[in-house]
Amino acid sequence: MTVPNVLAKALYDNVAESPDELSFRKGDIMTVLERDTQGLDGWWLCSLHGRQGIVPGNRLKILVGMYDKKPVGPGPGPPATPPQPQPSLPQGVHAPVPPASQYSPMLPTAYQPQSDNVYLVPTPSKTQQGLYQAPGPNPQFQSPPAKQTSTFSKQTPHHSFPSPATDLYQVPPGPGSPAQDIYQVPPSAGIGHDIYQVPPSLDTRGWEGTKPPAKVVVPTRVGQGYVYEAAQTEQDEYDTPRHLLAPGPQDIYDVPPVRGLLPNQYGQEVYDTPPMAVKGPNGRDPLLDVYDVPPSVEKGLLSSSHHSVYDVPPSVSKDVPDGPLLREETYDVPPAFAKPKPFDPTRHPLILAAPPPDSPAAEDVYDVPPPAPDLYDVPPGLRRPGPGTLYDVPRERVLPPEVADGSVVDDGVYAVPPPAEREAPTDGKRLSASSTGSTRSSQSASSLEVVVPGREPLELEVAVESLARLQQGVSTTVAHLLDLVGSASGPGGWRGTSEPQEPPAQDLKAAVAAVHGAVHELLEFARGAVSNATHTSDRTLHAKLSRQLQKMEDVYQTLVVHGQVLDSGRGSPGFTPEDLDRLVACSRAVPEDAKQLASFLHGNASLLFRRTKAPGPGPEGSSSLHPNPTDKASSIQSRPLPSPPKFTSQDSPDGQYENSEGGWMEDYDYVHLQGKEEFEKTQKELLERGNIMRQGKGQLELQQLKQFERLEQEVSRPIDHDLANWTPAQPLVPGRTGGLGPSDRQLLLFYLEQCEANLTTLTDAVDAFFTAVATNQPPKIFVAHSKFVILSAHKLVFIGDTLSRQAKAADVRSQVTHYSNLLCDLLRGIVATTKAAALQYPSPSAAQDMVDRVKELGHSTQQFRRVLGQLAAA
């Protein structure tokens, strides 16, 4: 009896790469003469248009039940290998099957004409059967599988096909094998749904690379480290056609609901899909009718078989009497006639604080323009904003009494801020706890020109030059002192010789006095800046600068104390070389402290010092404190129009935030890892790209604000580097022979305590950062939290740099330097990825990259701490 050959359909185009291979196009029907011909796994011998050749089997689909009426012989192709008997195995057991017996010409069976996507189930006739496990259809990927090299040698299959155990295609073996000629029906064919003709997927990731995540995956904290949960990274919720899925909690995104569902089935659709505007007892809850995206239509008179009508707008008018299934399908009803409806904060996760329930302004949140008087280009008047203003329209300030009474008439409303705002203290805190605090507002330009009683503020350019000169003076004098005294580990130091000789007394005294003088001059400059900070628009700048100044004051007092001990003790019996060592150890940290103070002043120079005015045609004395209105108006026209005035703490609860659109990026860009010139260049490029963030500034909850303030205090706490007053928790025990010296061990133990204390702060900052990202906070929030992470980790970099300079052992210096450089590189990466995540918000891939960098930083800081502990115990 002649066995007809099975037909196969081409799923992809194929270009022949050898003379023995067939070329075909997608959709061609060809006759399969032999599978795995001559032992070539995956290569089938086929006939197409009268020509025979081998083709890659993974680019074909067997047409079940369809055979070639005119059987085609093997022809000139390679001869088929005779089939071999297959050992008896129970059903469901996978065993290697010889290729010739695994795929053989199919026996004729009775069948009815069916569609191309239905498998036939012939009547079983044998007791054993050979099993071949193949993947089920998955419409997730569209790239054709790679074909194997067209050689005639035995090869291993190019891909392995993992699939669930239920998707088994039972291919009948050869005629000589005691097997069953049967196909098992796949699970999807029995439910009557369409089967997609898509090649099998190799894994949850395709040939084109990793699919970008649809949601940012935040690691969870385990002990002191952070790990990703494996279950979260494998959730592919969008790769199955929706009509094949039952309604469930996964239907939460951008697809309108299906008609005919009950009201309680809409609870999970909480994002971008508005509910249907249905009135009457059978309609949906009116509390859910919020936004302006057209939902699907729900008609009670239609059958439930109709699905997902998209193009009928929702109802806007709510002033008609309620009736059964009454719809208002119109857009032209003014919002003022709409019925007020309560605001449900659970429907909007980005709006953390809802307005009061009795407020009538909660009705039309986004699609109603603000009142006409709220314009940006009109100076504010005496009108106070009403409760219905829900936009970021600047509130009007209360004018000073003399303006309200009409005694002073002045068109320059932006030139000088009212005294009430410039002098009155406020309890409001700004959200950003940056190292710069540079805020651009309508008051910043004018507050620079306010003269402090008794002293004239320096011009901006002169102040910056003086600051650089003072910082350089501190570094130069300290370097001269260290060169004179010499490091304890240096070969040329005064203690490195066999007979230690102290440096000359006069030279040492002059070097110490020079250090004192340089630090004192820098402190005087900083004190003047602190005085200027009381008159800036940033209410927190004075407190931040005062903390930086106090840190430098403590360093200066320590230098003075050690210098006095050195002067009074030299030549006396009580003087020891350790006194000089303490002075040297204290002096080593002075340049770094001066650099931090100078960096802070440099970043806020535009707020602390007076801008250089452009020369005018009038006399030099025209720039007095109280110019006439004409001069003031001309000065306003000569500079750019300032941004709208800020909210006051009494006007709005979000008074903690800056009103400048680019203020958060300006605060964030300068974190002591980037120069001011580079910052100004990149800042201009960023702001020219357009709107970095247009959404309103959300209001933090009380708990988040408390956490933010606590982190700000912890991050601003300076590192204790006074080794002279430190006593170890346990007495120092001598290490093993050939280990660290006592000075290195004491140094490591001292900074190990500092490292552990700062690791706690860093862990808290990372937790708060991950919480902000997981709750989808805007860039204003997560950028501020990332600054806490960066500043906390920067303290560990400072500890590593200090240890690498002061340690004597080469092994300690090399390991500490390695981890310090690693942390510094990670911080640069976090700065770059955070900028990208803020600019591309709400891109999940950019945010995920930022989260991964912070997670890597957490692991590296734990390794740094362990290395310090191991070195101290050596």
Curated annotation (Swiss-Prot):
The modification N-acetylmethionine is found at residue 1. Residues 420-430 have a biased composition (Basic and acidic residues). Gene3D superfamilies: Alpha-catenin/vinculin-like, Serine-rich domain, SH3 Domains. PTK2/FAK1 activation mediates phosphorylation at the YDYVHL motif; phosphorylation is most likely catalyzed by SRC family members. SRC-family kinases are recruited to the phosphorylated sites and can phosphorylate other tyrosine residues. Tyrosine phosphorylation is triggered by integrin mediated adhesion of cells to the extracellular matrix. CDD domains: FAT-like_BCAR1_C, Serine_rich_BCAR1, SH3_BCAR1. Residues 750-800 are annotated as: Divergent helix-loop-helix motif. SUPFAM superfamilies: SH3-domain. One of its GO terms (molecular function) is SH3 domain binding. Residues 139-155, 621-659 have a biased composition (Polar residues). The modification Phosphothreonine is found at residue 273. A motif (SH3-binding) lies at residues 639-647. Residues 71-177, 374-394, 409-450, 610-662 are annotated as: Disordered. Disulfide bonds: none annotated. Coiled coil: none annotated. Contains a central domain (substrate domain) containing multiple potential SH2-binding sites and a C-terminal domain containing a divergent helix-loop-helix (HLH) motif. The SH2-binding sites putatively bind CRK, NCK and ABL SH2 domains. The HLH motif is absolutely required for the induction of pseudohyphal growth in yeast and mediates heterodimerization with NEDD9. This is Breast cancer anti-estrogen resistance protein 1. It comes from Mus musculus (Mouse).
